[in-house]
């Protein structure tokens, strides 16, 4: 029987985070967004029209998601991410975590290699659904193929366009090596999470691994609309090669789709009428300006030794302040000034001893433009006296 993904109960608050919500003035966690950027007027108008004009949407829909939405997604992914698929290969679900739970059923008995550091929720979902995870330390090009071979895994979960949380982009030669690894033995598959691929500010993103391998290659492509629309808008999708698609359709034939049909059709109309592409373009420009403003404010108010990594893409970057006395001291000092962020070591599955010292992960997608100077000033007050090179 197919298994649902299960998210574990919240852990006790780590020592280097703040539990009192009232103390937080500036949330630099990576899951935050600026809700004022949500296209509420156009989205609401479409949804209202559907509510009154499409009563059939109250009925159960296609198990994979409504076909016209899947066609829009396939066209969008083909144009912007080079994904090679038809609408039939697209599966819509309520978040990547749910879709990973479905994949865990399809890959029962497998072992997954995961990036270290990496996205801890992915590891939790896979392991809670019976897929052991083996951490593989990334390098400057992403997940190393030799270490992947040594792991003994037949699945490989990667974020090649924008590694979370370091921001590393996997170059074309490493991508080709990864695809060769998957093709070398039957039963090997790559789970490609195209995290944050819409937000690349310096250069165009490389084509997806799925597009490089072809429609029936050994790659499952996953993406979400959480960052481009809102985290509370639980719409994600995966693209399955034909062999896996047939198993999915057989094993999940009795399952209803987990996304409201009104939400599906609203997104479909939003994409079909060009709203989505324009919204992404506006978001990309807005976040690029905020990234540049935040980086400039940090450099102006902090030690000149402060370094920023990963700012070229995604909605967060790594801040390293040599001689600060460790990431825990940095996180705690920031919390006293009302700023929430996490240390880099929190994203390690193991071997955090290899973690870059004095480094924290700072997301800026939840900051409004007018809050950037104050947030940077708060970090300046927190960290100015911590570095070995005081200004």
Predicted regions and their residues:
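N-terminal basic, amphipathic alpha-helical segments
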Residues: 1-48, 253-260, 268-271, 281-286, ...
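Short glycine-rich anion-binding loops that position phosphate/pyrophosphate groups of nucleotides
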Residues: 33, 161-164, 227
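Conserved core of the PLP fold type I
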Residues: 47-187, 198, 202-215, 220, ...
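A generic "structured core" feature
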Residues: 116-125, 153, 189-190, 200, ...
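Conserved acidic functional residues
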Residues: 191-196, 303
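Conserved core segment of the aminotransferase class I/II
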Residues: 217-285
């Amino acid at each position: 029987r197919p298994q649902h993904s299960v998210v574990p109960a919240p852990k006790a608050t780590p020592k280097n985070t703040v539990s009192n919500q009232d103390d937080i003035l500036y949330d630099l966690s990576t899951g935050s967004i600026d809700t004022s950027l949500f296209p509420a007027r156009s989205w609401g108008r479409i949804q209202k029209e559907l509510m009154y004009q499409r009563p059939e949407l109250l009925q159960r829909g296609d198990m994979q998601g409504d076909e016209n939405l899947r066609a829009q997604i396939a066209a969008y992914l083909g144009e912007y991410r080079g994904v090679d698929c038809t609408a039939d290969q697209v599966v819509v679900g309520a978040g990547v975590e749910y879709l990973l739970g479905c994949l865990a059923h399809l890959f029962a008995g497998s072992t997954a290699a995961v990036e270290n550091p990496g996205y801890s929720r992915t590891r939790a979902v896979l392991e809670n659904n019976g897929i052991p995870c083996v951490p593989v330390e990334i390098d400057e090009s992403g997940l190393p193929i030799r270490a992947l071979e040594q792991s003994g895994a037949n699945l490989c979960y990667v974020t090649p366009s924008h590694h979370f949380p370091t921001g590393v982009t996997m170059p074309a030669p490493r991508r080709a090596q990864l695809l060769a690894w998957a093709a070398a033995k039957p039963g090997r598959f790559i789970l490609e999470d195209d995290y944050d691929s819409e937000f690349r500010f310096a250069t165009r993103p490389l084509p997806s691994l799925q597009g490089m391998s072809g429609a029936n290659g050994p790659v499952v492509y996953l993406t979400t609309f959480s960052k481009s629309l809102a985290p509370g808008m639980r719409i994600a999708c995966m693209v399955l090669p034909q062999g896996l698609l047939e198993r999915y359709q057989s094993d999940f034939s009795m399952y209803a789709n987990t996304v409201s049909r009104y939400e599906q059709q609203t997104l479909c109309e939003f994409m079909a009428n060009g709203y989505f592409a324009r919204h992404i373009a506006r978001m990309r420009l807005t976040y690029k300006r905020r990234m540049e403003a935040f980086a400039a404010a940090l450099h102006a108010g902090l030690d000149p030794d402060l370094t920023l990594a990963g700012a070229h893409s995604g909605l967060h970057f790594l801040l390293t302040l040599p001689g600060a006395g460790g990431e825990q001291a940095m996180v705690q000092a920031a919390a006293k000034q009302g700023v929430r962020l996490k240390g880099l070591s929190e994203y390690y599955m193991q071997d955090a001893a290899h973690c870059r010292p004095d480094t924290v992960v700072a997301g800026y997608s939840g900051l409004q433009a007018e809050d950037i100077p104050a947030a940077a000033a708060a970090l300046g007050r927190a960290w100015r006296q911590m570095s070995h090179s005081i200004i």
